[in-house]
Regions:
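Phosphate- and other anionic-substrate recognition elements at nucleic-acid/protein interfaces
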Residues: 1-132
Length: 132
């Protein structure tokens, strides 16, 4: 059974403390998906490189897990140029078998591509700032 593709060009991110693994899935008119993968530093320079890499591949829809606090700088940089979806890890549970960061990023990309990820609520900056 094939799943319906809702996003023909999107990216799944596996975010860690010091690096990010990115997987862009690009689906052609025949339904074949080609993946482009890269690893970036999670520091400022790496985040700019990630943003540039996404733009180079005309990818403006991104999904990542809300892993601790590590997603925050990634979200803050990418929301300037992309539509960013933050997913609770329970909705991106990986497949069984050998788990790698490359496979995790591809799995998030596949789930996002097929619209199978429920987005987490992120309060607007004004609401989040006024709560403290």
């Amino acid at each position: 059974m094939a799943f319906k593709i809702f996003r023909k060009n999107c990216c799944g991110l596996d975010v860690h403390k010091t690096w990010i693994f990115a997987c862009i899935g690009i689906t052609d008119a025949n339904g074949r998906t080609e993946y482009k993968q890269a690893r970036f530093s999670s520091f400022s320079g790496g985040l700019r490189e990630l943003s540039d890499w996404l733009a180079k591949h005309s990818c403006f829809e991104v999904c990542m897990e809300s892993s601790g606090k590590y997603w925050i700088p990634v979200f803050n940089i990418l929301e300037q140029t992309c539509s960013v979806t933050l997913a609770h890890p329970k909705y991106t549970k990986p497949r069984k078998g050998n788990k790698t960061d490359r496979k995790d990023a591809e799995w998030i990309c596949d789930l996002f591509m097929c619209d199978m990820i429920k987005p987490s609520f992120i309060p607007p900056r004004t609401s989040a700032n006024s709560a403290t």
